[in-house]
């Protein structure tokens, strides 16, 4: 799953500070500068509660002062007073109106911004207003209105990109707009032009339109807008985040990018930049090192608070670790902060999913996807929840919806393949091939590919794939002996992978090697019943009955009702008894089986007992099965017959 939050305020507001000739991307909005001739201070007669009068002065300095101390309501009131002073001017200063809109952007008054710009059709007059109009509509989640904005005539032509999916004005409307532009002075229009170039508003506008197309699931139009924005400015930070969030990069290019970034991260050890920390956490998450991911996100949250772009990665990490308590606390914080976005409810759904309350998880994940139908992570989680409710068709529908939202992501194809693996190996391999083509170096995907091959009984192929995953996880070369690889530290998440390699080695007759993998998995997870029972089976085949019995006892102590383990133990006991020749043993004539075995308290269904704290002990081989007692009784019966015949023979000899 991706780590960038879908609910952050993901539009890029360019900075209004003086940037000069720097090519650094603008990612935040500074407080707007102003000239002394504009927004002159206004004194208004006001009264106190006691009835005394005083003059309240509204000025830009007062607005800045209120913003600095966080009193946004007073800042809005003073800004409105200043704007009201220029409304009745015969020749309005359009630059002053733009500065007022910038103040409203800082204050996040999106509805008022849309109204003021639409009132004078300013978005059709200049690119500055077009950008702010698109941003306001986007923040109000009016994505169709953003796509319908007629701003194509304001964009510079670029023959390399081709026609843009942006509306333009008709011929009649175009003449009307030109007449409106003539109402404003040339100096004002030139000042707005300089401001838009300095702030790079044209690429910022196209990125906002592109993200609106993505919300409308029109990825082709979005890519055209993004390519146009990159042709004008290829240093925009938001483009990188947008393409990573919606998986817009081709798999080969993305793998090259990740390889370069992984090398660069090695140069930033000890760096506390949140971007560096998030990339390190994402890298650890992809490699299955979830405890390391949690440690990095803990550091990030401690230094910078709950960073919005890291929240979804932390949710996924806590879910994989099954840290339900931390998920519950994080969900409460997110819901109390902003319950009107899907991310808090996604966290709540993951909490119920982690504790096994699938019905409640289904309710909250449904609410999450209804609030934002383009939330791909929500659809993937919805598919997981439906899978555990044994609704496979609906689960695959959710994965299909996610694949349409992020068609270059591997996860929807991976989980669809796993759904088909139970009844259609052909379709399973097809979708698994799609997932591998999109992320060939993802160890989780290669592990599931190996599992599909194992299910199809292609053990040689599965063995190669599992070992490839082992080398990926340990970050070692394939020429290193497997004994040295197993000495490296491996995250506990990968203990099923080691168990699977042991299964293949056991099936191919390499029993000692299989025991080595099982022992590594047991050290990572001491109560891993499958590995313990498999170790016992290997020892049984090797003829080490004592060791096999010991490990079978351990397995049944953890899971006493496991019928498979009980059957394996029973077959081992039967095989060991068949190899023991009873006829070669001499028993006393008056042998009484109850005398020798009654004191051991034989239980016919011993596995029904509840396990005690000191472990559950399986009865010994001699006293655990009824067929052996039958063999002893037959032997005693034959001995009695022989003793009965001996006196007759002695009498004949005497005669």
Swiss-Prot record:
An annotated GO cellular component of this protein is:
anaphase-promoting complex
- What does the UniProt keyword field contain? Cell cycle, Cell division, Cell junction, Developmental protein, Meiosis, Mitosis, Neurotransmitter transport, Repeat, Synapse, TPR repeat, Transport, Ubl conjugation pathway
| Phenotype of the disrupted gene, per the record | RNAi-mediated knockdown results arrest at the one-cell stage of embryogenesis.
Q: Could you tell me which InterPro entries the record lists for this protein? A: TPR-like_helical_dom_sf, TPR_rpt
Disordered: where is this region? Answer: 1-30
Organs and tissues of expression = Expressed in GABA motor neurons.
The entry assigns this protein to a family as follows: Belongs to the APC6/CDC16 family.
Q: In which pathway does it act?
A: Protein modification; protein ubiquitination
Q: How does it assemble?
A: The APC/C complex is probably composed of at least 12 subunits: apc-2, apc-10, apc-11, cdc-26, emb-1, emb-27, emb-30, mat-1, mat-2, mat-3, such-1 and gfi-3.
List the disulfide bonds in this chain.
none
Q: Which organism is it from?
A: Caenorhabditis elegans
Q: What does this protein do?
A: Probable component of the anaphase promoting complex/cyclosome (APC/C), a cell cycle-regulated E3 ubiquitin ligase that controls progression through mitosis and the G1 phase of the cell cycle. The APC/C complex acts by mediating ubiquitination and subsequent degradation of target proteins. Developmental role in early embryogenesis and the metaphase to anaphase transition in oocyte and spermatocyte meiosis and mitosis in germ cells. Required for embryonic anterior-posterior axis formation.
The biological process GO terms on file are: anaphase-promoting complex-dependent catabolic process; asymmetric cell division; cell division; eggshell formation; meiotic cell cycle; neurotransmitter transport; polarity specification of anterior/posterior axis; positive regulation of mitotic metaphase/anaphase transition
What is the name of the protein in this document?
A: Cell division cycle protein 16 homolog
Q: Which domain of life is it from?
A: Eukaryota
The TPR repeats extend over 44-77, 203-236, 342-375, 376-409, 495-528, 530-562
Q: Source gene?
A: emb-27
Locations listed in the record: Cell junction; Synapse
Extract the coiled-coil ranges from the record. none
């Amino acid at each position: 799953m991706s780590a960038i939050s879908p609910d952050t305020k993901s539009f890029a507001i360019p900075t209004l500070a003086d940037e000069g000739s720097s090519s650094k991307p603008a990612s935040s909005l500074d407080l707007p500068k102003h000239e002394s001739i504009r927004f002159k201070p206004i004194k208004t007669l006001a009264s106190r509660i006691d009835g005394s009068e005083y003059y309240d002065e509204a000025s830009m300095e007062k607005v800045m002062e209120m913003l600095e101390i966080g009193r946004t309501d007073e800042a809005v009131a003073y800004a409105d007073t200043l704007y009201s002073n220029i409304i009745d001017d015969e020749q309005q200063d359009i630059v002053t109106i733009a500065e007022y809109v910038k103040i409203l952007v800082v204050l996040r008054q999106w509805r008022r911004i849309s109204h003021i710009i639409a009132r004078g059709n300013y978005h059709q007059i200049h690119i500055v207003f077009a950008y702010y109009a698109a941003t306001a509509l986007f923040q109000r989640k009016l994505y169709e209105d953003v796509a319908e904005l007629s701003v194509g005539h304001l964009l510079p032509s670029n023959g390399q990109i081709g026609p843009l999916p942006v509306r333009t004005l008709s011929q009649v409307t175009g003449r009307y707009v030109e007449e409106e532009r003539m109402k404003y002075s040339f100096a004002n229009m030139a000042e707005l032009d300089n401001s838009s170039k300095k702030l790079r508003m044209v690429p910022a506008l196209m990125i906002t339109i592109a993200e609106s197309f993505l919300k409308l699931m029109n990825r082709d139009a979005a890519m055209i807008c993004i390519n146009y924005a990159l042709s004008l400015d290829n240093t925009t930070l938001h483009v990188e985040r947008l393409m990573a969030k919606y998986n817009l990069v081709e798999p080969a290019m993305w793998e090259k990018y990740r390889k370069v970034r992984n090398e660069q991260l090695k140069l930033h050890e000890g760096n506390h930049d949140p971007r560096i920390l998030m990339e390190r956490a994402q890298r650890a998450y992809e490699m299955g090192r979830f405890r390391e991911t949690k440690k990095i996100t803990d550091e990030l949250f401690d230094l910078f608070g709950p960073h919005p772009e890291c929240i979804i990665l932390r949710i996924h990490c806590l879910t994989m670790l099954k840290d339900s308590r931390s998920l519950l606390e994080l969900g409460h914080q997110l819901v109390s902060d902003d319950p009107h976005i899907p991310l808090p409810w996604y966290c709540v759904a993951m909490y119920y999913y982690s504790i096994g309350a699938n019905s409640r998880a289904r309710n909250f994940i449904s609410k999450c996807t209804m609030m934002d139908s383009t939330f791909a992570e929500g659809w993937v989680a919805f598919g997981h929840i439906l899978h555990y409710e044994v609704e496979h068709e609906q689960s695959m529908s959710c994965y299909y919806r996610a694949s349409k939202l992020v068609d270059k992501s591997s996860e929807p194809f991976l989980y669809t393949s796993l759904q088909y693996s139970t009844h259609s190996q052909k379709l399973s391999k097809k979708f698994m091939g799609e997932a591998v083509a999109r992320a060939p170096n993802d160890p989780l995907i290669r592990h599931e590919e190996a599992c599909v091959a194992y299910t199809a009984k292609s053990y040689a192929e599965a063995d190669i794939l599992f070992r490839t995953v082992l080398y990926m996880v340990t970050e070692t070369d394939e020429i290193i002996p497997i004994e040295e690889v197993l000495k490296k530290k491996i995250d506990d998440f990968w203990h099923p992978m080691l168990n699977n390699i042991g299964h293949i080695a056991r099936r191919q007759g390499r029993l000692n090697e299989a025991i080595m993998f099982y022992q590594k998995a047991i050290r990572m997870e001491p109560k891993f019943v499958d590995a313990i029972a498999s170790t016992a089976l290997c020892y049984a085949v090797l003829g080490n009955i004592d060791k096999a019995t010991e490990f079978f006892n351990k397995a049944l102590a953890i899971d006493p009702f496991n019928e498979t383990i009980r059957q394996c133990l029973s077959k081992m006991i039967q095989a060991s008894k068949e190899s023991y020749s009873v006829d070669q043993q001499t028993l006393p004539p008056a042998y009484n089986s109850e005398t020798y075995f009654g004191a051991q308290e034989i239980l016919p269904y011993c596995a029904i007992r509840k396990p005690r704290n000191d472990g559950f002990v399986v009865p010994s081989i001699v006293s655990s099965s009824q067929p052996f007692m039958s063999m002893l009784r037959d032997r005693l019966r034959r001995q009695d017959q022989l003793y009965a015949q001996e006196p007759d023979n002695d009498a004949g000899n005497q005669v």
